[in-house]
């Protein structure tokens, strides 16, 4: 099955997949082509039968989400926006900025005149480099909605000149920092109507829900702590909230199709889990429905059979887990994380080149050091990332963090069950494990000294 994927900058990529494969196979192939490791921030959108924009559930089969028509046309977009300093790859940052620019042009992100001038200069520096009178182009009218005056053009030009020498990556980072300060940065918008038929825009963000008029004029803001639950029934979504006086109120939002209603229902759960939870709860991750054939098979064959299974939510990691996972991938590739973007192919090539330069004995030592490092990471507190794991939650028994961090938690970050008490545990310390390993390898290292010197001499000869 052929798939055409459109990026935010209108570049179309082509991949071929099995129609019975999961949607994540498409995303993984696209991100691999672009050298992106931070896959979890992105998703694939398609247009529904009523013209609504919908997210493909990447955990389900492609044929369950869209019509198996070749070529399948999808859009690569940022699903979960994070702060610019949390983005570790330049390629990821570039796609973030392109998506943000698209949102500004559509009107869902609004800048004042001063911000628009600064953003125009940064975008020009990122796209065209240092200021040149004959080639300088600015997108002020696109992002601000008004044609610039002569004075405005001069101001943008002066701002652009002041950025001389700034690299493309740095200009994109500064532009993304500017946009991330806006109120609606990272908010996902859904078109709906209230119980009286008035057109609304429902925005789902990191802190809660924004209820706005069709022109983005705010009506009400619902923070996550006041939202009791959200349910979907057909084309309607019901959001139960708690008022200041303690009373519960149910808000009704109507949509053009059940798929659009399901989009808001999914967004509330997925965005809340991604930004505000330590880990995705199993009740969210494993929630699914079955078609008629799958239901019959589960009754007569096996309850755990995958036939006809369709996951409700498309969320597998939280923002903290994605960031930590990316750092580990960069670390395992032997690359220090300093906020600069590094392509996946470059990481892989760096690791291969390093391994090829090693002799067999040196490679064994390097592999052992990597294993020790992974062991040390596994025994380190997942919350503070400084102390060693020294506590177990009772009654669930999970060991996740140090005693100081565990004593401040009321529920287990792994299974979300309530914590009755925290039990002090004594695991082998990282220092003792590393000392033991060093003792075991000392004789081996001494015997290999001559070989290692030869390896080093060969390396120096190559560099010369």
UniProtKB/Swiss-Prot annotation:
- The protein, known as: E3 ubiquitin-protein ligase MYLIP-B
- Under which EC number(s) is this enzyme classified? 2.3.2.27
Q: Which UniProt keywords are present, listed alphabetically? A: Cytoplasm, Developmental protein, Gastrulation, Metal-binding, Transferase, Ubl conjugation pathway, Zinc, Zinc-finger
Question: Which segments does the record annotate as RING-type zinc fingers?
Answer: 381-416
This chain's function reads:
E3 ubiquitin-protein ligase that mediates ubiquitination and subsequent proteasomal degradation of myosin regulatory light chain (MRLC). Regulates cell movements during gastrulation by acting downstream of fz7 to antagonize the frizzled-signaling pathway.
Q: Which intervals of the chain form a coiled coil? A: none
Q: Which Pfam families does UniProt cross-reference here? A: FERM_M, FERM_N, zf-C3HC4_3
Q: What class of enzyme is it?
A: transferase
Provenance organism:
Danio rerio (Zebrafish)
PANTHER family (UniProt xref): 4.1 G PROTEIN, E3 UBIQUITIN-PROTEIN LIGASE MYLIP
The protein's matches in InterPro entries, at most eight in alphabetical order, are given as: Band_41_domain (IPR019749), FERM/acyl-CoA-bd_prot_sf (IPR014352), FERM_2 (IPR035963), FERM_central (IPR019748), FERM_domain (IPR000299), FERM_N (IPR018979), FERM_PH-like_C (IPR018980), MYLIP_FERM_C (IPR041790)
Its localization reads: Cytoplasm, Cytosol
Question: PROSITE patterns recorded for this chain?
Answer: FERM_3, ZF_RING_2
Q: Name one GO molecular function term.
A: ubiquitin-protein transferase activity
- Disulphides: none
The superkingdom listed in its UniProt entry is Eukaryota
Checking Gene3D superfamilies in the record gives:
1.20.80.10, Phosphatidylinositol 3-kinase Catalytic Subunit, Chain A, domain 1, Pleckstrin-homology domain (PH domain)/Phosphotyrosine-binding domain (PTB), Zinc/RING finger domain, C3HC4 (zinc finger)
Q: Which GO cellular component terms, listed alphabetically, does the Swiss-Prot or TrEMBL entry include?
A: cytoplasm; cytoskeleton; cytosol
């Amino acid at each position: 099955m052929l798939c055409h994927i459109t990026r935010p900058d209108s570049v179309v990529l082509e991949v071929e997949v099995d129609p019975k494969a999961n949607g994540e196979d498409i995303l993984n192939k696209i991100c691999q082509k672009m050298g992106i490791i931070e896959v979890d921030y992105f998703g694939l959108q398609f247009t529904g039968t009523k013209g609504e924009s919908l997210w493909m559930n990447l955990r389900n089969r492609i044929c369950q989400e869209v019509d198996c028509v070749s070529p399948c046309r999808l859009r690569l977009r940022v699903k979960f926006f994070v702060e610019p300093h949390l983005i570790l790859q330049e390629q990821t940052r570039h796609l973030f900025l392109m998506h943000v620019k698209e949102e500004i042009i559509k009107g869902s992100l609004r800048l004042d005149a001063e911000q628009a001038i600064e953003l125009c200069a940064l975008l020009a520096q990122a796209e065209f480099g240092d200021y040149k009178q004959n080639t300088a182009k600015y997108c002020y009218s696109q992002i601000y909605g008004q044609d610039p005056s002569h004075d405005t053009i001069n101001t943008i030009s002066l701002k652009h000149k002041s950025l001389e020498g700034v690299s493309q990556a740095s200009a994109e980072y500064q532009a993304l920092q500017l946009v991330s300060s806006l109120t609606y940065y990272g908010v996902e918008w859904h078109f709906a109507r209230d119980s009286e038929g008035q057109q609304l825009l429902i925005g789902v963000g990191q802190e809660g829900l924004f209820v706005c008029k069709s022109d983005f004029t705010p009506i009400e803001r619902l923070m996550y702590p006041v939202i009791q639950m959200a349910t979907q029934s057909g084309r309607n979504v019901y959001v139960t909230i708690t008022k200041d006086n303690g009373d519960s109120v149910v808000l009704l939002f109507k949509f053009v199709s059940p798929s659009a209603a399901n989009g808001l229902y999914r967004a509330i759960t997925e965005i809340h889990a991604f930004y505000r939870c330590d880990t995705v709860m199993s009740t969210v991750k494993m929630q699914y429905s079955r078609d008629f054939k799958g239901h019959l098979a589960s009754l007569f064959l096996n309850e755990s059979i995958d036939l006809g299974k369709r996951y409700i939510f498309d969320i597998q990691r939280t923002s903290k887990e994605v960031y930590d996972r990316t750092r580990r991938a960069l670390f395992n590739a032997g690359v220090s994380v300093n906020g600069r973007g590094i392509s996946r192919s470059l990481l892989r090539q760096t690791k291969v080149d390093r391994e090829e330069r090693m002799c067999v004995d040196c490679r064994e030592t390097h592999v052992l050091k990597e294993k020790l490092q992974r062991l040390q990471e596994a025994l380190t507190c997942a919350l503070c990332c400084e102390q060693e794991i020294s506590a177990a939650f009772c009654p669930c028994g999970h060991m996740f963090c140090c005693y100081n961090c565990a004593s401040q938690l009321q529920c287990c970050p792994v299974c979300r069950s309530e914590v009755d008490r925290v039990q002090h545990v004594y695991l082998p310390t990282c220092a003792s494990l590393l000392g033991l390993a060093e003792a075991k390898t000392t004789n081996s290292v001494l015997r290999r000294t001559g070989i290692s010197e030869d390896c080093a001499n060969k390396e120096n000869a190559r560099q010369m």
